[in-house]
């Protein structure tokens, strides 16, 4: 597993065995995960999202503290998956990292509790599957506008992006929700174990 430029975000690249019958891989290994992260992934919910090309969704901490850790993979098509550090007090607060997840490499992306998550479908029928450490709580969701220039995510310029949730009460500009009580705090988050460095705005 490779530590990305956002603290608490890791990328796993599985070994894929291919022959005339097809292919086989392990897109998640509990032992490898625990050795790198320092604790097991608690599984409370598994989600599957199928999106048309150009649709983009983002959320920050969709459960009460400490938040919801996620382990994400793309089962079909291709997505640009983005991690944003929205945890107050984090050494990488405000930074983002983006990776292309697709059905060819079958990589897995881990996001620690409290990290913001956004993805954009680069193909039709892009299928994202993710394991969650806590159940989703709709009334606790806090979404940040993924297209806000204050964050500066470098989305593809050759696709007309269709943001999901734009204009809803929880879909805030980036600067507004920095006050206490809206964004999650870094201290006490179980996933805040590896304090990586990095640059603001790391692209794929």
From Swiss-Prot:
Region annotation (Disordered) ranges: 164-204
GO molecular function: dTDP-4-dehydrorhamnose 3,5-epimerase activity
Entry's EC annotation: 5.1.3.-
Chain residues that bind substrate: 21, 26, 45-47, 70, 117, 141
Signal sequence segment: none
Enzyme class: isomerase
Keywords per UniProt: Antibiotic biosynthesis, Isomerase
UniProt cross-references to PANTHER family, sorted A to Z: DTDP-6-DEOXY-D-GLUCOSE-3,5 EPIMERASE, THYMIDINE DIPHOSPHO-4-KETO-RHAMNOSE 3,5-EPIMERASE
Function comment: Involved in the biosynthesis of one of the two 2,6-deoxysugars, dTDP-L-oleandrose, attached to the macrolactone ring oleandolide to produce the aglycone antibiotic oleandomycin. Probably catalyzes the conversion of dTDP-4-keto-2,6-dideoxy-alpha-D-glucose to dTDP-4-keto-2,6-dideoxy-beta-L-galactose.
Protein name: Probable dTDP-4-oxo-2,6-dideoxy-D-glucose 3,5-epimerase
Organism: Streptomyces antibioticus
Gene field: oleL
